[in-house]
């Protein structure tokens, strides 16, 4: 059974999206995991805690004996069945535990006894995690062009369409504003960083990459923050600013935040609950900036939002949302972005409408 243990092996695993059967406890997996990993634990959280306590009090032999006692009989058989099925479904995969220690070796030996030879990651998740961190540090040293522009400028789509683009908001599962949440929960910080590293490695491997195209993001994207090595490089990067007509921006925002989000919520929850979730999503976004709007203006816009939702529910039209969206852009989002852009005006190297910026980026 060939084990993977070199730096290049670890990178190759991430680039290839190699399926990883992660046998750590769920609590460990939730704190941080690799993008292509599935969690099929040797021990659940309670069993792991009990073995850990035993190890501290009585030593490794007693802890190992307790582990075998806890994972025995029907419990062991159920977990064996799950591992066997995963191995057969992912014949090119690998086993992984925290450090390539006892847990992955135990599962590997049990599978071998059942007639399945399956490799493991020597060094475990810790080695893969260190590889992800180091890869991000190295790849972030390449030149970066940032795509800037006011809300609704189509920055994310422009980045997505570039072969050297990395969609930071897509990886973070958040669009970076008060209304930025999606139906997918955000990953833990470590898992987000691992996903970003894998995406950068894959993008770099597909081409002779000269520079990155990224969206001009703040440090935080929802609850995730950009790795400091990348954030530092972004603060030094050139910026291309999309300056589309206001009406085109409104069309994009209508499609993204009203039509698409309503569709996504109803698709996920059904018509009735989906509508309630959609309404709560919009109200939550507006409420998040209440303090900056001021109570009186917030109440006015919230009332317009309620009226727009009533119209949308009864007629299907989203046009009523313009009554609160337009002043929100004119009074809050646009002035805020222009203020932020003024502070880095010396880094702006190109301005134009969406298609012009896209063409300029391709020529870099």
Swiss-Prot record:
It is an enzyme of class 2 (transferase). The active site is at residue 97. Involved in the post-transcriptional modification of the uridine at the wobble position (U34) of tRNA(Lys), tRNA(Glu) and tRNA(Gln). Catalyzes the conversion of 2-thiouridine (S2U-RNA) to 2-selenouridine (Se2U-RNA). Acts in a two-step process involving geranylation of 2-thiouridine (S2U) to S-geranyl-2-thiouridine (geS2U) and subsequent selenation of the latter derivative to 2-selenouridine (Se2U) in the tRNA chain. Keywords: Selenium, Transferase. GO terms for biological process: tRNA wobble uridine modification. It catalyses: 5-methylaminomethyl-2-thiouridine(34) in tRNA + selenophosphate + (2E)-geranyl diphosphate + H2O + H(+) = 5-methylaminomethyl-2-selenouridine(34) in tRNA + (2E)-thiogeraniol + phosphate + diphosphate; 5-methylaminomethyl-2-thiouridine(34) in tRNA + (2E)-geranyl diphosphate = 5-methylaminomethyl-S-(2E)-geranyl-thiouridine(34) in tRNA + diphosphate; 5-methylaminomethyl-S-(2E)-geranyl-thiouridine(34) in tRNA + selenophosphate + H(+) = 5-methylaminomethyl-2-(Se-phospho)selenouridine(34) in tRNA + (2E)-thiogeraniol; 5-methylaminomethyl-2-(Se-phospho)selenouridine(34) in tRNA + H2O = 5-methylaminomethyl-2-selenouridine(34) in tRNA + phosphate. Pfam families: Rhodanese. Transmembrane segments: none annotated. Belongs to the SelU family. Its EC number is 2.9.1.3. The keyword Manganese does not apply. Residues 14-137 form the Rhodanese domain. This is tRNA 2-selenouridine synthase.
């Amino acid at each position: 059974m060939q084990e993977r243990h070199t730096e290049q092996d670890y990178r190759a695993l991430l680039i290839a999206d190699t399926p990883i059967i992660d046998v750590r406890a769920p609590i460990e997996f939730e704190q941080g995991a690799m993008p292509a990993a599935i969690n099929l634990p040797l021990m659940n959280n309670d069993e792991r805690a009990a073995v850990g306590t035993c190890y501290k009090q009585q030593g490794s032999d007693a802890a190992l004996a307790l582990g075998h006692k806890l994972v025995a009989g029907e419990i062991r058989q159920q977990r064996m069945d799950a591992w066997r099925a995963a191995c057969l479904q992912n014949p090119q995969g690998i086993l992984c535990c925290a450090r390539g220690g006892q847990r992955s070796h135990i599962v590997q030996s049990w599978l071998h006894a059942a007639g399945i030879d399956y490799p493991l990651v020597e060094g475990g998740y810790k080695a893969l995690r260190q590889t992800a961190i180091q890869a991000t540090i190295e790849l972030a040293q390449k030149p970066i062009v940032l795509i800037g522009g006011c809300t609704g400028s189509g920055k994310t789509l422009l980045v997505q369409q570039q072969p050297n683009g990395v969609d930071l908001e897509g990886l973070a599962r958040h669009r970076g504003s008060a209304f930025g949440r999606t139906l997918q929960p955000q990953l833990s910080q470590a898992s987000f960083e691992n996903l970003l590293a894998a995406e950068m490695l894959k993008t770099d491997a597909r081409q002779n990459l000269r520079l990155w195209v990224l969206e001009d993001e703040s440090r935080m994207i929802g609850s995730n923050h950009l790795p400091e090595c990348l954030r530092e490089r972004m603060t030094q990067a050139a910026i291309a600013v999309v300056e589309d007509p206001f009406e085109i921006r409104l069309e994009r925002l209508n499609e993204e935040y009203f039509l698409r989000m309503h569709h996504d919520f109803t698709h996920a929850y059904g018509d009735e609950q989906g509508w309630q979730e959609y309404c709560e999503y919009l109200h939550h976004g507006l409420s998040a900036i209440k303090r900056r709007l001021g109570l009186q203006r917030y109440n006015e816009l919230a009332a317009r939002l309620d009226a727009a939702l009533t119209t949308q529910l009864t007629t299907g039209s989203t046009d009523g949302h313009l009554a609160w969206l337009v002043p929100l852009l004119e009074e809050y989002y646009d002035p805020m972005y222009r203020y932020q852009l003024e502070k880095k005006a010396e880094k702006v190297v190109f301005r134009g409408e969406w298609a012009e910026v896209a063409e300029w980026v391709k020529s870099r």
